[in-house]
Amino acid sequence: MTVDLSPATLHARVVVDELIRNGMQEAVLCPGSRSTPLAFALAAAEAAGRLTLHVRVDERSAGFFALGLTAVSGTPVAVVCTSGSAVANLHPAAVEARFNHRQVVFLTANRPPEMEGVGAQQTIVQRGIFAHDVVDELILPAAGREVEAQADMQGWNAHWRAALCRIMARAAASAGPVHIDIPFREPLTPPVDGPVSPGDVAVPPTDEAFLPRCWQGRPAQRPWTEVCDTATVDLSLRTLVIAGQGSWELPALAGVPTLCEPGGRTFGVPLNPLCVPALLADPTTAPQQLVVVGKPTLHRSVTRLLADPTRPQIVVTAPTAPTEWADVAGQAQTACTNLTVTGESPQRWLAACAEADGTARAHVLDVLAGLRAGQRDADPGWLPSGLEVAYAVGEAVAADPTLLLFVGSSNPVRDLAVTHPDLGPHCWVNRGASGIDGNISTAMGLALHHPGPVVAFLGDLAALHDSGGLLVPTLENAPKNLTILVANDAGGGIFATLEQGAPAYEDQFERLFGVPHTADFEALAAGWGVAYQQCTLAELAGVLTSHAAQAGVRLVEVCTQRRHRHALAATLTGR
């Protein structure tokens, strides 16, 4: 039977189900109103024989009772309470659990965020209430009043379960307490025609009366994301590696097709990201599983691929940060720090990847040729696009193994990703928060230690944003060979490639997003005592290879245009 469940009931049942899958065998409940959904979910789980539920009246006592339980059992124990000062009464137990390295899960109900700060009854700011006395804290987003579309349901389910697996992994890794705060919207009680009390017939968690199919967890009671030291990858399946920023060498993946972002590591056959739609269009060439290394951030086609729940994903994280795996969509089935492999990549899969990659690379070259032929001859005021500059930069890096390239966020890194998707370790990018902060300063630091030449490829706004990084005190060491290459399109060209760059918004685009300027980079360089050179696209290759004759820091400017960036992006991606 299928029963219509409120968002609060669904939320609570998903949380209880996933915590049990992550090793919770006992829970301590303090009666309260806002925690009603959790109370009924725990009772149903106990009736199904999945955990033992204890009830205590006082939250302070309940917290220490849970501490005693986990001290002997060695398994995580949850303490559940309502909102308000009830949560504060758990703090003494949190202090003791932290000092005793015990996995107590403080599971607190809360009012939805719109009720904070407006005088709502029994409502306090519960975020951060345990301060440094928990090893981690998770604020699960409140479900809406209505959750209707199945895709929305699957998205909520994946995010909730993945977040719970992550915080439980951190509790285990740090051997300490964690705080999970859950805002619930009314109605708080389950339907009367569903399993609501221990007196009902026990309902297994796979029964759709307990959780509809799209809200259920992994088969065989596995955690949504299994955390382990070593995972095994069967390469006889069509396996695609996605290597983002911070990825590192994994010899086991040698020879496996790889989508590698600038700054990542290519393990096998490097693929142009533009080939993803072609691979997915044919069921016989679509990847059957994904291995994610590092933090992928650049391509929307890859983001959509990672959000697909039908394709198993293994995420590899650094041994120094085993609980910091990248999984934005919450679809990873396994998170590990090392890999072993069985089988070999099918030759048909390798051939399909090579063909799709070759087609994508040829398409990029055709687009570049069209830009040169179509605009340069027809427009006396022609300026190159940033894509053409990126191609010249990529060619220079590919030709000189001693050269280290720093790539700025926004258009430079995206352009380089499609013109030269296999530069890998020759690049460095600051994509942690994808900002344009401190790009020149980062390049200065790289250049001070790198034994060869360094080129920083930046947009004009990134260069202006950190122009102060050009200042090196006279008594300090300056880089010996740094070229700061600025592709100057006089504004925010990245926005022209996004939705707001569509023709429908043209009348407001320049003021709100393009932000045109007339900054003088020659004067700026002179003010900081840095050598300056302006060059054309045709001259750029020679300028980039002239580093042997130069010393110190120089700023090279190539004037570009962004009038056709939206159309160019559409042409590249086939939108």
Where are the predicted features?
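Phosphate/pyrophosphate-binding active-site segments
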Residues: 2-6, 144-151, 155, 294, ...
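Active-site diphosphate/adenylate-binding microenvironment
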Residues: 12-16, 20, 33-38, 363-451
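A short, small-residue-rich loop immediately preceding and capping a beta-strand
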Residues: 25-29, 50-54, 72-111, 288-294, ...
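Active-site nucleophile and cofactor-binding loops and adjacent substrate-binding regions
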Residues: 29-33, 53-64, 79-85, 408-409, ...
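Glycine-rich, anion-gripping cofactor-binding loops and their flanking helix/strand elements
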Residues: 71, 89, 224-235, 239-331, ...
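Thiamine diphosphate
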Residues: 96-97, 103-110, 114-131, 144, ...
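Internal gly/pro-rich beta-alpha loop/helix module
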Residues: 114-210
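Glycine/aspartate-rich loop-and-adjacent alpha/beta segment that forms the canonical ThDP
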Residues: 128, 174-222, 543-575
